[in-house]
């Protein structure tokens, strides 16, 4: 396989399929949303098979792996160390912002702190989170922490524009947890971008590892008459569970165009949280087998020696793996329709003693 072959082409070869032609969203990074709608055409809606003629680079609108000039720079997947102390002050603002969800595709999102997903939070089991939430948007929003054991009617209530709330909770259970807006209709608020990950470390540290976090989610697009050059949520596509993009960390295939560099035989710990709102993540690393998988908060009985693990909507799991030799290892949701729509990336195992020329393509930016 050459460096110019894309990850999706490689995955299709593994699956014995032929990549479908690119949809209008993301197919041309210079295209404007008002020039081409993201929907499938009427024949597809009627159930006709899609055109299977592969485009020139079989890239689903994304640059080949490591292609020079691939843009935009990726959202960092590196998990930052936990802040010291047992009391963590966290402040978030809910506001609406335009974000890029695929190459050249802008979306009018609802956000925590202006980005999708929201900031990654990290504490230790038994730590206290002192949380402040401020609504700077023009509609009601709220917060639901899956890691918290508190009364929803008291703390997860809707905040009107300009309102705020403060409360504390103790993170009693370790694991990889989702947080999200809980305002009805919840599916609309999640599909518009209001979610993030909260990592709760066990009291006894896990073995040292390179740690990465991936939040899977979906986008359902239609033209936005209110925000020039951006898409908005298609409510009926969302109800029909027909996403235009399925993504890790808010942007389709960003870690295919910008692989994440790791070392061969290095222990990797991947925190995978699935915001949904509709699609289960069938998380898999091509060319590797998970040594241990901690489902949700269960540290006592990890799965061992497994190939693919489902992460349900609203759930999260912790995966440990070693990539046994130098090379490129795609990670995907093994629901390949979702991988084709952007739930795909690459872990690039590079020997640290190899010459710099061995690192083809740009390094991970973080």
Language model segments and positions:
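Bacterial N-terminal signal peptides that target proteins for export
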Residues: 1-7
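Conserved RecA-like P-loop NTPase ATPase core
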Residues: 10
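C-terminal motif of bacterial Sec signal peptides marking the signal peptidase cleavage site
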Residues: 13-16
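Copper-binding active sites and cupredoxin-like electron-transfer domains
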Residues: 18-366
